[in-house]
Regions:
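ATP-dependent carboxylate-amine ligase catalytic core
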Residues: 11, 25-27, 31-49, 72-160, ...
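Charged, amphipathic alpha-helical linker segments immediately N-terminal to NTP-binding catalytic cores
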Residues: 1-27
């Protein structure tokens, strides 16, 4: 599936046009092209500040956000590489705490693309190379790298010597690339394991644990799993993390949802099982309040979209696009209802399990309004509406999120979900571009 990117900077847009002409088909996973590309650029991946590498089906981005928050609370400067972007391409590359500026971004993309002849790199491989160039040339205390897709054959896995690796929640997604079983997918995620480097994981069903353990053992990586090597407990207002000889109690994260407490604990566990940085307890506690991660159960502020709704309504946004991600969203919606109707405005890419997502959300939603996802192959809104009706939900279609919200005629909790690309449209339309 081709990616899409635009910029208000002519210099950046010229390079994004070159970048968007690249076609990341199903055959591009692998480390050969990214290795060849980085070699032509002087191997910047070998000169990165200490790397924290995070994989997972859901929650890896939030885990990276908590890692960054803890490090910055400790007074450290941090690079972050994540994907996809929501509104601006610059969101993918955070250099020493700040989103990459347009001049640097344009220059780096041009530098990478200019040496790519004969390699045929993908969109993501070029972006990864540009990020690594930026990080290698700019001082910082650490580098946080979110896996793009899978792990074993993801371009970010060219990094051979991270200081710690982690795997967040697992589920079924990207089957065309990673396989159709949760066990196979778990093995792909565990492919980021490196010899002698701690692989910190959540707790998973036994078959997934066994596959991860086997992959890690083959790589020579020790596995430290939740429930065995470290634990976390979420209460009404606090999260308690504990491992051998250490415990810390934080407030529950400001990021909404019980799953975010687990993501916070995973980040703490990763920080506890690496030796490159010293992060004081106060910084671990601060991470719960400091972390920000847009389009993950985010309540939108008053703006052009939010103001369409009747008084007493709330507009929420989440990028959930697979059944595993829909589960905590459904739980959060139930706690927000307070006697109001819950309306789901949704659009999903054509390769997503729309039926599964709607099935998990059905018990928490009263009405569904299906919309298109502009610029991407997506499930037709009429098809989504039919799937919602099959779950005994009232369902209609609309041409846009704004048109959908205009049909809400009573105070409601409205959630836009189903695609990070749709989430980006909503943030832009409501004037909330991530910074």
């Amino acid at each position: 599936m081709a990616d899409h990117a635009t910029s208000s900077s002519p210099a950046v847009q010229a390079q994004l046009d070159r970048l968007s002409a690249l076609s990341p088909g199903a055959d591009v996973l692998g480390l050969e092209r990214i290795g060849a590309l980085l070699a032509r650029l002087g191997d910047p991946h070998l000169a990165l500040p200490p790397v924290f590498h995070v994989a997972g089906t859901n929650g890896k981005g939030s885990t990276c956000a908590f890692l960054r928050a803890a490090m910055e609370a400790a007074g450290l400067s941090v690079h972050v590489y994540s994907s996809p972007h929501l509104v601006r391409f610059n969101e993918r590359i955070r250099v020493a705490g700040r989103l990459i500026d347009d001049d640097m971004l344009a220059a780096l993309l041009a530098e990478v693309l200019d040496v790519a002849d004969g390699i045929a790199p993908s969109f993501f491989e070029v972006t990864t190379a540009a990020a690594f160039l930026a990080f290698a040339r700019t001082p910082a205390a650490a580098t946080i790298v979110e896996v793009g897709l899978g792990g074993r054959l993801d371009a970010t896995n060219i990094i051979a010597d991270p200081v710690v690796t982690g795997i967040a929640a697992l589920g079924i997604d990207h089957q065309a690339f990673l396989g159709r079983s949760a066990v196979t997918i778990a093995g792909e995620k565990a492919g980021i394991a490196k010899r002698g480097v701690s692989l910190v994981t959540m707790d998973y069903p036994r078959p997934l644990r066994e596959r991860i353990a086997a992959v890690a053992a083959a790589a020579g990586a020790p596995v430290l799993s939740r429930g065995r090597d470290w634990t976390s407990e979420t209460r009404r207002s606090t999260v308690r993390y504990e491992d051998a000889g250490f415990s810390v109690v934080t407030r529950r994260p400001k990021l909404v949802g019980a799953h975010q407490s687990r993501n916070l604990a995973l980040a703490i566990a990763m920080l506890r099982h690496q030796g490159a940085l010293r992060i004081p307890e106060a910084a671990l506690r601060a991470a719960a309040d400091w972390a920000k991660w847009p389009a993950r159960m985010q309540r939108l502020s008053p703006g052009p979209l939010a103001n369409i709704l009747p008084d007493g309504s709330e507009l929420w946004l989440d990028g959930a696009h697979n059944p595993s991600a829909a589960t905590p969203v459904a739980r959060a919606l139930r706690s927000m209802r307070r006697g109001r109707s819950v309306v789901l405005v949704t659009g999903m890419l054509a390769n997503k399990d729309a039926r599964g997502v709607l099935r998990f959300l059905a018990s928490s939603v009263d009405r569904v309004i299906a919309v298109p996802v502009g610029g991407h192959d997506h499930h037709a809104p009429a098809v989504l509406a039919d799937l919602a009706r099959a779950e005994d939900l009232a369902a209609t279609t609309a041409d846009s999120v704004g048109a959908a919200l205009a049909t809400v005629d009573q105070p409601s909790v409205c959630l836009v979900a189903g695609s990070l690309y749709l989430a980006g449209e909503v943030l832009a339309a409501n004037g909330e571009t991530p910074v």
